Amino acid sequence: MKSVITISASLAISLMLCCTAQANDHKILGVIAMPRNETNDLALKLPVCRIVKRIQLSADHGDLQLSGASIYFKATRSASQTLNIPSEIKEGQTTDWININSDNDNKRCVSKITFSGHTVNSSDMATLKIIGDD
C-alpha cells in the first residue's frame, strides 16, 4: 500500500512539472553587449535555426538606445523582416512582445537577429537580452 501511495505521489509531481514546462515556451535566445558608440552591425546568430513567433527585449545591465532591428529567416531567398522596436530601453525594463513571422508563414525559422544601437548614460557596456516565444 505504501508503494502505491509513493508511486501515485511521484506521478502527480511529474505531471505538475511537465505541465509547468509546457506552459512557458519562452527561451533566452541570447545576449548582446551594446558598445558605447552607435553601431549598426550587432548580430545574434542562432546556432540552431528556431521557429520564433515573437520576441521580447530586455536591458539587463545599463540603459540602451536602439535605432533599428531586423530578423533573418533561413530560406533560399534569405528573407528578412524589419522589426518595430522602442528607441530606448532602461536598465531592468523589458519590452512588450514584438511579433514576427507576420505573413503567417510559421514554417520559417530564425537564423539571425541584427540590431543598431549603443549604450547610453553609462561608462560600462549595456547588455541586451533577447527572449523568444515559439
Curated annotation (Swiss-Prot):
Residues 1-23 form the signal peptide. Coiled coil: none annotated. Pfam families: DUF2541. Keywords: Signal. InterPro entries: UPF0412_YaaI. Belongs to the UPF0412 family. This is UPF0412 protein YaaI. It comes from Escherichia coli O6:K15:H31 (strain 536 / UPEC). The lineage of its organism: Bacteria, Pseudomonadati, Pseudomonadota, Gammaproteobacteria, Enterobacterales.
